[in-house]
């Protein structure tokens, strides 16, 4: 199955947290296996690293700004988030940005609440405004994927598995 086979050529994808561990892996795969244009919205915090993305661009012999554009933006700033969404004009948004250390979320929950809850809310508001301005044809294909964590399900039970029907049982501000 071809990656993004239901999307038009040169699909514009906005990925939040694209310089993080999982976001970086998603961007590398998209750059290698599609012709999409990636807008990497990241605040470039302590866990951000562009090295692997830059290596892929070099190996593909692609100019950095042609297929990958870094938008240094913190989602807790609504006006910057709205500007980034307007600028990228995405066909697809993948929301992977999050503060992600469970222990740190317990020690200082305020930062996690601001970043993970307010940041997500700001992105959703900006995406809604963007969606309302899309043509009928683009609305049919537009998607927003919010990627979460298995931490929302709490501690593994005796069977050691979660599935789509597992109940939420968060145990920390991170989850």
Model-derived features: positions:
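N-terminal Rossmann-like NAD(P)+-binding domain of SDR-like oxidoreductases, especially those catalyzing
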Residues: 1-175
